[in-house]
Each structure stands twice: as structure tokens, then as C-alpha cells.
């Protein structure tokens, strides 16, 4: 066999193999297709079964949800029905209770009406009895109802008035005792620490002469020397029979001091003529000015007050030559400063401010003859001008009541001023003013109704008033004393205090026969 044979055999075999392979492949493809169809049918059946199951499950869940909703609605309806039934029962109970209360109220109203009727019957009976009793009382007493009411009211009024007066008296006495006790403690302590020793000033000064011949030289030829001296100083020279003495008379202490110094220098010098007199008067004025400044500085040093304007110091020095009722004003101011400071310390108030006001309180008297107005107001304006504080300005202006005090220091200075002025021997007043004050005191007392007589005693520091017992009772005496005190305080000016003593005396006299 040749190669061609083998090739043909090989080709045939290959063809057979290809055919067999195609058959096998086709068979496998058919098998796979059949299996795929089966799988598709199986999956479809499973999907249909799942869908049916889910459908049934959804239907079941919907039925269950509907059942739950129906049960919830039924439960809520049941609860609402129960609530409505409960409210209905409560309303029924309340209606029953209201019916019972209404019935009880009707019963009470009926009972009250019966009681009201009984009360009206009793009142009518009582009114009838009262009218009978009133008629019987009027017949027995001889007084009408209005007269009896008036009598009773008058008795009650007198009793209340008496009790009120007694109560007021007790309160006033207690308050006065407490206030006096504390005031005495403060003032006594202040006074015992402040020893002021000065005498009353006068309006005249006596200059001693070496011999009586000097009188003629002072008078000079045709009186030229004495006229020159009087003209330059403004002081009257009184030359009388008094041996070896010349009297200088003048109300201005500064002028009087200038005249005294000039005259004493002229006497020592021995040369007395108008030109020399003029020279000595000028020297005396300069000496007095220096003395004024020194006195002001000494006053501030003595009281411990610093920072005063130089003009205020000069005005303080001028107060040495001023008097008030014979009391030296500068020494009085120093005394008031010490007293105010001591009382302020006792009361826990700033003593420095109180002392400052006390020292300056009468500063207006240094210029009051040059400026019109009360010295307190003048002093406050001066203090304001030289830049003192508002409290100092107010306290100076208020120490005599010309201004309303705005600080405790102002009130303390008022008290210290009164203490210094009222100290025995500190001041004096003219006989005429003293007599007028006593007459005015008795006049105020005699103007009151029921006064029989009055006497001003103790140098005008006490007024004793005898009243008619048939006109005034004890309560009226208390009221009279209070009214007289108010009138004295408003109409009189006086140092210290005045005691008003109202005396009511009843005497019963019988004779045994």
C-alpha cells in the first residue's frame, strides 16, 4: 500500500472523528438545552411558589394589622364609653348632692326667716321697753335725751383730755429727763475741760496821769489838743474832777484802744500838740493793726485751726476789740470753739470741723457796723468769700436761726454758743433791757385766761403764775404752761432758759362756832 492509501485512510478517519465529535457535541448541547429548560421550569415554578407564598404572607400580615387596628379602635371606644359612663355617674351624683344642698338651704332659709321674725319681735319689744325706760329716766333725772348725751360726752371729753394731758406730761417728763441727762453729761464733760477766764468788757477806759497838771496840757490852748485827739480817734475824752485820771469813752473798742495807746505815748513823751498828736495816733493805729493780726494768729494756734485765709485771721483779731453784752467776742469765739470740739468728740462727730465753725461763728461781728444785716448772715458770706466749705458757711449762718442747719456741727455750735453766753458772769445787759424783758415776761403770762397774778423772779429766769382754781383745772394748767413756753420762745430773746411755773391752789375755809 502506497502513501496515498494511508492518506485517504487518515482523512476518512479524521472525517469519522469529526462526525463523531459533532454528534457528541450536538448530543451534549441537546442535553444541556434540556437541562436548561428543566432548570428554567424549575426556577419558574419556584418563583411562582415564592410569589404565592409572599402574597399569602402579605395578605396574612394585612389581615393581622387590620385585626390589630380593629382591636385598638374597639378598645378606645370601650374606654371612651367607660369614661362617658363615669362622667354621667359623677354628674348624677353632683346633681343629687346639689338637690340635697338646695333642700338644706331652703330649710335653713326657712329657719332663718323664723328667727328673723322672732328677732324683729324681740327688737320691737326692746324698743318699746327702751322708750318706756327713757321716758322714766327723763322724768326721774329731769334731763332730756340730748341733754343727757351732752352731759355724758362732756364727762368723757374731760376724762380723755385729762388722761391725754397726763400722758403727754409723762412722755415729756421722761423724754426731758433722758435728754437732760445725756445733755448734762456731754455739756458737763465739755465745760470741765474748757476753763475760760475772762471778765466783761466796758465802753470806757481810764488812763492814769502822773499829775493833775497833765490835764491842762492834754486840753491845750483853747482846747486844741483835746479836739485834735477826739477828731483823729473818734473817742470822747472826759476830764472831770477825778484826780490824776482821764476817761476815754467810745463804743468802738478799736478806736478806744488807739486813743489809749496814743494818749499814753503822748504822756510819756511830754510833747503834746496837734502835730505830735497826729503822729502818735498813726503809730497807735499801726500797733493796733499788728496786735490784731497777732491776736488772730494766737486764736488759731490756741484752738488748733489751720488753713484760714489771712483776711479771716485779721477779722478774728478784730474780734478782740468787740464785745457782746460786755463779753469779749474773740474770747467768746475761742470758748465756743473749745466747747463745740469737746461736745463733738463726746458724740463721735468730727471735732476739727466743729471747732472751726465755733471759732468763726461770730466773724460777722468784726464788720457788722460796716455792712447791713444780721451778723450770722454777714459771717456766712465772709466765710464763703474766703472759700470755706459749704458746711462751715451754713453752720455760721445758722447759729442764730437765720438759716436752716444742715449738719450736726451747726447744731453743736448753736449749743456751745448758748452755753458760753449763758455762763454766769459771761454777759451783762443794760438795766433798761433787763426791765423790759421782765415786763414782757409778765405781760405774756397775764394775757392768758384764768391768770390771777404772775411774778418774774430769779433775774428773769423763772416766771411764777398764780391761776384761778375755779377757771382752770390741772389739765388746763399743763396746757397753759406749754402755750406760755411756746410764746416766750417765739417773742423773747434771752440767755439760757426760762422756767415757767404754773401754780393752782384751792383752799377750803370753814369756821367752827
Curated annotation (Swiss-Prot):
Function text:
Endoribonuclease that initiates mRNA decay.
Q: How does it sit in the membrane?
A: Single-pass membrane protein
Q: List localization entries.
A: Cell membrane
KH domain: residues covered:
203-288
| Ranges annotated as spanning the membrane | 6-26
Q: Which GO terms describe its molecular function?
A: RNA binding; RNA endonuclease activity
What is the recorded name of this protein? Answer: Ribonuclease Y
**Primary localization class, coarse:** membrane
Q: Which domain of life is it from?
A: Bacteria
Give the protein family. Belongs to the RNase Y family.
